[in-house]
């Protein structure tokens, strides 16, 4: 009876509290996740949305008085920036650590992947031959055959910085610099626009191949982004690079518990909630990402295959090599 009473008091103390999330994810579907967590636990979710850099500056300004419990963002590089400032604490939940392999967790287990995405190729099948895409890789985009045919966004984009960092980790800085210089020479235009703009350029005949994150094609095919993007998405095909070798570059959406979290127990519960099978299934069906748990992906993404060879480079390397990647991209004239 005493043990039961202690448990009830513990649960009630959790219910009485809240969890405060700083997020740079911009998915409307996340709001439904927050509400589901509240419905399931009784814990109120307070959300502050913004750009990753602005939220990081806010955390630094707030210091020990910060109300934030969790930092939720996209790209391992952004999580690394928060960790570099000493703003995370190690995740102690065995439930979380047992579900996420070490290459998808940060140093010291200070952050974890919640979902995955791959940086893939989108091509126009009317302008790219089957021979050209056979055994295609990131490295092969340096070949002369791609001169004036490739579009990709700017070098100040974190997704590209992390891709280059992963290539440095795999191939070394010197070889990656040679590759990046050739890639710049093969671009169809000066980098401009977001990932979807690259896919649109291929669909519209401005280029033959785009490098972009996988989930964008799901968003476009869903029709939620409008008829123009839906029609464009139907004109292109997606392919995973490096399937005969090291595998396609994989990055993450991820989260960590902040060092000065006033509600660390609730924060741990929230991470466990995000990695539960039911939530993983619902989340990736709406965000078009790939799950951490072994659950079904969205119908839109399943059209391109449910399994692919993933590069197993630890995502923590993307942050560690970020400064090197930025300098390299600058040296080769990647605008």
Model-derived regions, located:
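Periplasmic-binding protein-like
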Residues: 117, 179-184, 189-193, 230-259
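Short, hydrophobic alpha-helical packing/hinge segments within bilobed ligand-binding/sensory domains
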Residues: 55-56, 79, 138, 198-199, ...
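Bacterial N-terminal signal peptides
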Residues: 2-12
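Extracytoplasmic ligand-binding site segments that recognize negatively charged/polar headgroups
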Residues: 24, 28-31, 67-206, 220-221
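Mature extracytoplasmic/periplasmic domains
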Residues: 253-313
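Extracellular/periplasmic bilobal clamshell ligand-binding domains
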Residues: 299-335
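Early extracytoplasmic/lumenal segment of secretory-pathway proteins
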Residues: 16-81
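A ligand-binding cleft/hinge motif common to bilobed small-molecule-binding domains
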Residues: 77-81, 209-233
């Amino acid at each position: 009876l005493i043990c039961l009473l202690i448990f009830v008091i513990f649960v009630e103390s959790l219910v009485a509290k809240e969890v405060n999330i700083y997020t740079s994810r911009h998915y409307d579907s996340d709001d439904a996740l927050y509400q589901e967590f509240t419905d399931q636990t009784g814990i109120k979710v307070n959300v502050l949305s913004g750009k990753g850099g602005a939220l990081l500056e806010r955390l630094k300004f707030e210091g020990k008085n910060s109300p934030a419990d969790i930092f939720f963002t996209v790209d391992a590089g952004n999580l690394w920036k928060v960790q570099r400032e000493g703003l995370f604490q190690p995740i102690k939940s065995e439930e979380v650590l047992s579900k996420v392999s070490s290459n998808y967790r940060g140093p010291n287990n200070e952050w974890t992947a919640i979902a995955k995405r791959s940086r893939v190729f989108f091509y126009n099948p009317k302008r790219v031959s089957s021979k050209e895409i056979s055994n295609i890789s990131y490295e092969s985009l340096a070949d002369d055959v791609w001169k004036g045919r490739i579009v990709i966004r700017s070098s100040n984009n974190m997704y590209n910085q992390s891709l280059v960092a992963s290539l440095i980790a795999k191939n070394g800085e010197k070889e990656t610099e040679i590759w990046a210089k050739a890639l710049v020479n093969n671009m169809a235009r000066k980098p401009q626009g977001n990932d979807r703009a690259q896919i649109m350029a291929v669909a519209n005949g401005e280029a033959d191949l785009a490098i972009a994150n996988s989930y964008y094609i799901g968003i476009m095919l869903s029709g939620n982004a409008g008829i123009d993007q839906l029609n464009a998405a139907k004109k292109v095909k997606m392919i995973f690079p490096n399937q005969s070798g090291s595998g396609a570059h994989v990055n993450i959406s991820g989260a960590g518990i902040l060092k000065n979290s006033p509600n660390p127990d609730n924060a741990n519960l929230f991470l466990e909630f995000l990695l539960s099978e039911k939530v993983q299934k619902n989340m990736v069906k709406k965000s078009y990402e790939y799950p951490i748990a072994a659950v079904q992906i969205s119908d839109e993404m399943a059209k391109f295959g449910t399994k692919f060879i993933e590069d197993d480079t630890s995502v923590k390397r993307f942050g560690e090599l970020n400064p090197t990647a930025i300098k390299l991209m600058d040296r080769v004239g990647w605008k």
